[in-house]
Design a protein with these regions (language model features):
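Flavin-dependent oxidoreductase catalytic core characteristic
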Residues: 1-262
Length: 262
């Protein structure tokens, strides 16, 4: 039996990747977020109860630092899972966000579990029925490896796919090239060129502090949104330069692709 009938012969990889873009947005990121909140909850409670030098270890700055990091990573993880789940609810297939989430959140899980093990000390090292962290810590490499190992996702998929899927003109240029549609290609090409020059001008003016990006809201977060807009303009310029200079060889230059993905 062939899924989709005879017309889908040879389309198995495409169907698998399309399903993966949805499933990978839900399973591993949600699992990593659950693990993060679980480890953070136990760590917060344990460090209040555990006392050293007659004070709770939660009051020691050396313990507060990893606890704060754990809280931040757990908050970021939960927020991103809500965002991508909302995208799926609206019928989208977030292939690139799913790759980002899978890679980043399982790496967050690695850091968070290491911090949890550190603040628990010997209690988390000895396996047994009262060790509520050891199994999760030992299972973390599974999440990092399955559904696209993080080393592959980071080096090939995030920017390798994102540079094409998320670009307003590259897909149109490739489609026009395949169909030999010169009119469509010229339209996409000159639009792409205009985007590059516009990005360059925006990146340099914002980089030198000339003008500020408009943001759709007011309040304390405005300055951070403007900083993100400035950095995004610089990133867009770097991405365009990498794509223009390396072309199809960009996927083979995995360290560059990985850094742009980061």
């Amino acid at each position: 039996t062939i899924i989709g009938g005879p017309d889908m012969i040879g389309q198995g990889w495409r169907m698998l990747v399309e399903c993966l873009s949805i499933g990978r947005c839900i399973t591993l990121p949600s699992g990593a977020t659950g693990t993060a909140r679980y480890a953070l909850g136990w760590s917060g409670g344990f460090t209040r109860v555990r006392r050293q030098f007659n004070v709770p270890v939660a009051e020691m700055e050396g313990v507060q630092e990893p606890l704060a990091r754990m809280a931040a990573l757990a908050y970021i993880s939960q927020a991103t899972v809500y965002q991508t789940a909302n995208m799926i609810d609206h019928g989208e297939k977030p292939a690139v966000p799913s790759a980002i989430l899978k890679s980043q959140l399982t790496e967050f899980q690695r850091v968070l579990l290491s911090d949890a093990m550190d603040v628990h000390g010997g209690k988390a090292v000895t396996l047994g029925p009262r060790n509520y962290l050891g199994i999760g810590y030992s299972a973390n490499p599974v999440a990092i490896t399955v559904e696209g190992a993080n080393i592959m996702t980071r080096n090939l998929m995030i920017f390798g796919q994102g540079a094409i899927r998320c670009h307003p003109y590259v897909l149109e240029e490739l489609a026009a090239k395949d169909t030999n549609d010169m009119k469509a290609f010229d339209k996409a090409f000159f639009g792409h060129a205009g985007l590059i020059f516009g990005n360059a001008a925006r990146a340099f003016t914002l980089g030198f502090g000339i003008g500020k990006s408009s943001v759709p809201f007011d309040g304390p977060a405005t300055i951070y949104a403007q900083d993100i807009a400035r950095l995004s303009a610089g990133f867009g310029l770097c991405a365009d330069a990498a794509m223009a200079s390396l072309g199809s060889a960009l996927k083979k230059r995995e360290m560059i692709s990985a850094r742009l993905g980061d």
